[in-house]
Regions:
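Charged docking surfaces used in two-component/phosphorelay signaling
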Residues: 14-22
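Short hydrophobic/Thr-rich beta-strand motif most characteristic of the beta2 strand and flanking loop
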Residues: 24-31, 39
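Receiver (REC) domain active-site loop signature in two-component systems and cognate sites
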Residues: 55
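C-terminal output helix
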Residues: 106-115
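Active-site beta3 strand of CheY-like receiver
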Residues: 44-50
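Short, glycine/charged-rich "phosphate-handling" switch motifs in NTP-dependent
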Residues: 99
Length: 124
């Protein structure tokens, strides 16, 4: 399996990337939504995107909306990983097409459990 970690924080990209790599998932990185869309085009086999909400240029919600507007990306699972904790934010992300929602800070165990719910763990 191949995934992208989309977050403007290099530290967060490294943390999530390390967890995914431990699960046998190949990872590419992007620092904002526009760069994330470029990576999707450059890496057509991506099956999962872990996406932050608050990023410069194009935020995570806008990224999810752009991805879901293109039917070619229907199989891509989009997991919002963010500090946004309000129920309204959660619903906006899910309504836009997020497959799952993970609130920061998170533990490795929570992240793996969320990925298991999407049948990602063990797929690699």
């Amino acid at each position: 399996m191949r995934a992208m970690v989309l977050d403007d924080s290099r530290t967060v990209r490294l943390i999530i990337g390390k967890i995914l790599a431990e699960l046998g998932i190949d990872v590419v990185e992007a620092g904002n939504g526009r760069e994330g869309l470029e990576r999707l085009r450059e890496h057509p086999g991506l099956e999962l995107v872990m996406v932050d909400w608050n990023m410069p240029e194009m935020n995570g919600l806008e990224f999810i909306q752009a991805v879901r507007a293109d039917r070619a990306y229907d199989p891509v699972r989009l997991v919002m990983v963010t500090t946004e904790t309000e129920q309204e934010q959660v619903m906006r992300a899910l309504d836009a097409g997020a497959s799952e929602y993970v609130m920061k800070p998170f533990t490795k165990e929570i992240l793996i459990a969320k990925l298991s719910m999407l049948d990602i763990v063990g797929e690699s």
